[in-house]
């Protein structure tokens, strides 16, 4: 069965905030970035599997940060074929668009968690418990930085 397409891509303004999500069944990593500066930062990790509290927390983040768009990491295998989580991530992207009405853009997230783990180890976070607490937010940062580096506007 073919996958349902994600939300239609939308043009983004030259300035404004983006929030990015590294969607997982137990955790969602969140990062924030600015279109003008083209820089992303890890923000936080949402914990729990229940949909209502997740979307309530996301609504609070949207109210606080007032983003002009959202980016959702889309997993795939190294050869580009869909990952078992691809359809769930696309559904999450569609739910974000439907609930909040903001442009939602998809971004390849291949190896983002591995890159996040390596970056945390290099930064001196060797305790696996401490790394696990921030891993998803750093993965979201990597996804958003990749998006900012490869999409849209010229760097200042």
From Swiss-Prot:
InterPro entries: RNaseH-like_sf, YqgF, YqgF/RNaseH-like_dom, YqgF/RNaseH-like_dom_sf. Its main location: cytoplasm. GO terms for molecular function: nuclease activity. GO terms for biological process: rRNA 5'-end processing. SUPFAM superfamilies: Ribonuclease H-like (SSF53098). Pfam families: RuvX. It is an enzyme of class 3 (hydrolase). It comes from the Bacteria. GO terms for cellular component: cytosol. It is found in: Cytoplasm. Keywords: Cytoplasm, Hydrolase, Nuclease, Ribosome biogenesis. Its EC number is 3.1.-.-. Belongs to the YqgF nuclease family. Could be a nuclease involved in processing of the 5'-end of pre-16S rRNA. This is Putative pre-16S rRNA nuclease. It comes from Aromatoleum aromaticum (strain DSM 19018 / LMG 30748 / EbN1) (Azoarcus sp. (strain EbN1)). The lineage of its organism: Bacteria, Pseudomonadati, Pseudomonadota, Betaproteobacteria, Rhodocyclales.
